[in-house]
């Protein structure tokens, strides 16, 4: 995959020699500071919904970026890995320029004050938001990938195709995932897509079915906007709605921490030893500020097992050599948005998303690593994402000791075996160690009809902390 148009892989273009740590006064920064949003996104918006309802097309209509990049994705015309794209949203300052026409989105390389493109308007536009889109796959077998993307979302666009009945299986499953992760109901926007394929009367009936579907769900407050992503119809109304999504109150002064959702080896085949670049980690900063030249640690890092099956973790330590938000080179990166971090880590350890789910932090300031967790679990009343006429089959059965589940902790994905069940509390032995904090939410999936299906969620109470071995060098 080419790194030229890749917002995360672009981070590899930084220098390979040691660099001095940048000094930043974090007390003067906010998520909407002009000097921040001019260079990097500070809010993550996910696109969710059933397969082929227009998630990637909507991101392309807003940002101009094609998120489907890999050969197998292009051949099958579906999203398989998490897609990502940045966009700047501007508003015309001419009071005679009416909404939503006064809103316009551009790629993240756009200048600070472009001229308004509405015919007859000579006003200038001001930057309102800089947004990262997390484009999730809609196929049922890729639900685990969707949950990884949901871990970094601040808001969401729920795509529902107007030419199909509502709800489709993954529409409900993705909406439940938003509720589990805890996305604010005010930060969800419903897009009734493919309006160019239906009559007005059909669109109105479909809109009523959407309203009925979202009653009592986390999307109950969401506005419903009719759009056509292919024709870019009503996209100005969508970006106006995105401007109503406020960035979270990030803690800029806390110890920096970033969850990794993609990682790359950006070296071309046949590159000489002198040309090799370190691995690139892509993800979203949760708190604090990362700076070029800073010493960082990636946990859990290298995981080994002895003859008795006891796990040992060796966190990876490195220095940040570059920070990128798409083509924008950064000296420091703040929470929100998707950031590419160029490091000196062996690229073989980063290729093919091998750092997925790991956490980057200052040295010695990372989260605890668990091999077993105890969590308070809440099961869904019925199975989502499955078409069935049998009500008994659709009900979610109780958890039993010895059962194997698929567990999403933050962006990490691992198997888990239930070792104890007591009331609503469950102990789960993890197949591979994972970073988490007490109180963190987890998603649980059970294997049903050869697919992992979302069955519930939980809150981490405690766990057996993993013994670590830190590389003395």
UniProtKB/Swiss-Prot annotation:
Chain intervals for the UniProt region annotation (G2): 77-81
Region of interest (G5), ranges: 228-230
Biological processes, Gene Ontology terms: cytoplasmic translational initiation; formation of translation preinitiation complex; methylation
PROSITE patterns the record matches: G_TR_2 (PS51722)
Induction: Transcriptionally up-regulated in an HDA1-dependent manner.
Catalytic activity of the protein: GTP + H2O = GDP + phosphate + H(+)
CDD domains associated with the record: eIF2_gamma, eIF2_gamma_II, eIF2_gamma_III
Gene3D superfamilies cross-referenced by the UniProt entry: P-loop containing nucleotide triphosphate hydrolases (3.40.50.300), Translation factors (2.40.30.10)
Cellular compartment(s): Cytoplasm, Cytosol
Keyword Transcription regulation carried by entry: no
Region described as G4: spans on this chain: 193-196
Region feature G3, mapped onto this chain: 135-138
Region (Interacts with CDC123): 458-470
Quaternary assembly: Eukaryotic translation initiation factor 2 eIF2 is a heterotrimeric complex composed of an alpha, a beta and a gamma subunit. The factors eIF-1, eIF-2, eIF-3, TIF5/eIF-5 and methionyl-tRNAi form a multifactor complex (MFC) that may bind to the 40S ribosome.
Alphabetical list of PANTHER family matching this protein: EUKARYOTIC TRANSLATION INITIATION FACTOR 2 SUBUNIT 3 FAMILY MEMBER, EUKARYOTIC TRANSLATION INITIATION FACTOR 2 SUBUNIT 3-RELATED
Protein name: Eukaryotic translation initiation factor 2 subunit gamma
Organism, scientific name: Cryptococcus neoformans var. grubii serotype A (strain H99 / ATCC 208821 / CBS 10515 / FGSC 9487) (Filobasidiella neoformans var. grubii)
Lineage: Eukaryota, Fungi, Dikarya, Basidiomycota, Agaricomycotina
């Amino acid at each position: 995959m080419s790194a030229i148009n890749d917002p995360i892989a672009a981070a590899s273009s930084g220098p390979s020699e040691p660099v001095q740590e940048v000094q930043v006064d974090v007390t003067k920064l906010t998520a909407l500071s002009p000097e921040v949003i001019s260079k990097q996104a500070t809010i993550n918006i996910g696109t969710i919904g059933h397969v082929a309802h227009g998630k990637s097309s909507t991101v392309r209509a807003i940002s101009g970026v094609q998120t489907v990049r890999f050969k197998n994705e292009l051949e099958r015309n579906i999203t398989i890995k998490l897609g990502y794209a940045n966009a700047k949203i501007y508003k015309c300052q001419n009071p005679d320029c009416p909404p939503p026409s006064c809103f316009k989105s551009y790629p993240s390389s756009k200048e600070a004050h472009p001229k308004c493109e509405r015919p007859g308007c000579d006003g200038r536009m001001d930057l309102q938001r800089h947004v990262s889109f997390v484009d999730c796959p809609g196929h049922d077998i890729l639900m685990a990938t969707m949950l990884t993307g949901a871990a970094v979302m601040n808001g969401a666009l729920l795509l529902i195709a107007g030419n199909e009945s509502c709800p489709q299986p993954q529409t409900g499953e993705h909406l439940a995932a938003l509720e589990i992760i805890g996305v604010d109901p005010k930060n969800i926007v419903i897009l009734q897509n493919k309006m160019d394929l239906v009559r007005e009367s059909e669109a109105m009936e479909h809109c009523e079915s959407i309203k009925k579907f979202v009653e009592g769900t986390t999307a109950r407050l969401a506005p419903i906007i009719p759009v056509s992503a292919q024709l870019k119809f009503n996209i100005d109304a969508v970006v106006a709605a995105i401007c109503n999504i406020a960035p979270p109150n990030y803690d800029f002064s806390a110890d920096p921490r970033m969850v990794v959702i993609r990682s790359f080896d950006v070296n071309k085949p046949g590159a000489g030893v002198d040309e090799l670049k370190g691995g690139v980690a892509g993800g979203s900063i949760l708190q604090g500020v990362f700076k070029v030249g800073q010493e960082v640690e990636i946990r859990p890092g290298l995981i080994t097992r002895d003859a008795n099956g006891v796990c040992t973790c060796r966190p990876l330590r490195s220095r940040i050599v570059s920070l990128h938000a798409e083509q924008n080179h950064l000296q420091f990166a703040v929470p929100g948005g998707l950031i590419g971090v160029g490091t000196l880590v062996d690229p073989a350890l980063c290729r093919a998303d091998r750092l997925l789910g790991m956490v980057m932090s200052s040295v010695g300031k990372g989260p605890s690593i668990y091999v077993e967790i105890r969590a308070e679990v809440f099961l869904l009343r019925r199975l989502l994402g499955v078409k069935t006429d049998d009500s008994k089959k659709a009900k979610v059965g109780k958890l039993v000791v010895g059962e194997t589940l698929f567990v999403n902790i933050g962006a990490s994905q691992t198997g888990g075996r239930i070792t104890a069940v007591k009331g609503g509390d469950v102990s789960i032995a993890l197949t591979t160690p994972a970073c988490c904090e007490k109180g963190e939410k987890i998603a649980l999936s059970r294997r049903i009809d050869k697919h992992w299906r979302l069955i519930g969620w939980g809150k981490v109470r405690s766990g057996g902390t993993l013994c670590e071995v830190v590389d003395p060098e």
